Design a protein with these regions (language model features):
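Short beta-strand segments that buttress and anchor functional surface loops
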Residues: 70-73, 106-107, 129-136, 145, ...
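Hydrophobic/aromatic beta-strand elements that line small-molecule binding cavities or substrate pockets
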Residues: 54-61, 93, 116-121, 143-150, ...
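Positively charged n-region of N-terminal signal peptides that target proteins for export
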Residues: 1-5
Length: 180
């Protein structure tokens, strides 16, 4: 009976310890590589095209002590529903570590009240979050959040855009690693 109790206690201790190790924050290097995929955007600011299809290309690579992230979004929106207009948006951000583990500051991040974009990133467990904040001349802010979460099958993207507290757009998608 004592042997069974000890065995059960041992198994319980292993099971209880597993989630803690599974929830450790990954290193930024785990995200390095080229990623490709697609998703769907839900837009509050569009009358005719509330949902649009998007393609994504993301490259995350080392840059000094930090990292650089380049991404391209292909947006199919507007025009004739059978032949929508296609636009490409490209962005590049370079981030360096702060004194806080898992927190990075943008190398050319500015003062949003002076018309400059402010951005930073946070690494928490298996999610790399990038935040961008802008303030217009009337003091109305826009906050964008890109969550890139690694899973066994690749990367999950969740994007949210708020303007003065109101949801403007949400994008969800999946990406797979397409290169180093």
């Amino acid at each position: 009976m004592m042997r069974i109790a000890l065995t059960l206690a041992f198994l319980f201790a292993i099971a209880a310890g597993a989630p803690a190790s599974a929830q450790q924050t990954l290193s930024i290097g785990t995200f390095f590589g080229a990623w490709s995929g697609g998703g769907v955007a839900e837009n509050e600011d569009s009358i005719y095209f509330r949902s649009t299809v998007r393609d994504f290309d993301v490259t995350i690579r080392p840059a000094g002590a930090g990292f650089r992230i380049d991404w391209t979004t292909v947006i199919r929106k507007g025009g004739n529903p059978d032949k929508p207009d296609i636009r490409r948006r490209k962005s590049t951000k370079t981030l360096m570590p702060t004194g806080t583990p898992g927190v990075f500051h943008g190398t050319d991040s500015g003062d949003p009240l002076s018309g400059k974009e402010m951005y930073w990133a946070r690494l928490d467990r298996n999610t790399l979050s990038l935040f961008l904040m802008m303030v217009d001349k009337d003091g109305i802010y826009t906050l964008q959040q890109y969550d890139r979460t690694l899973s066994g099958t690749g990367m999950r993207l969740s994007f949210k855009s708020l303007s003065d507290g109101d949801r403007q757009r949400e994008v969800t998608g999946r990406l797979i690693k397409s290169g180093k």
